[in-house]
Amino acid sequence: MIEINVYYKKWYSTIKKPKIFVKNVIKSSLINLNIYEYKPIISIVLANNILLQKLNYEYRNKNKPTNVLSFPYDKLNKKCNLGEIFLSLDTLIQESIDLNIPIEHHTCHMLIHGLLHILDYNHEEPLMQYIMESIEIKLLDKLGIRNPYVSRETIYP
């Protein structure tokens, strides 16, 4: 089950039908990762810089906003609670402008990035970064979105 909370109402004027948009991205990713049949519980909060900065400081001791934060809970198994993903629309908009890409594409990328984190992927070491980025690229391609790493350095919170 995918639970979506629109904490920051500006999401409605930026992404058309944000709850459906997010649900489709996560569902597609779970299907392509061959784990949709597990029916995991995933909570997604569509937020802003104020909330993400607060959470980033509280949990990572970084007093600044970020694009995505993930909080993994259970390991993958039937109907487990995989975790929560928080997105900041403010940061995503600014990064989309800086990267000259559609906000929808960048939002898809950061949703997938957050999903992979709650599935225990990370980018702390070069090999893990390569694996994680490779999966992101494949999942984005399934959504018709080009490789975000072609002409830029990676963006990580």
From Swiss-Prot:
Its EC number(s): 3.1.-.-
Q: Which domain of life is it from?
A: Bacteria
Where is this protein found?
Answer: Cytoplasm
**Where do the annotations place Zn(2+) binding?**
H113, H117, H123
The entry's cellular-component GO terms read: cytoplasm
One record GO biological process: rRNA processing
Q: Which HAMAP family match?
A: Endoribonucl_YbeY (MF_00009)
Family the UniProt entry places it in: Belongs to the endoribonuclease YbeY family.
Task: Please identify the protein, giving its name as recorded.
Answer: Endoribonuclease YbeY
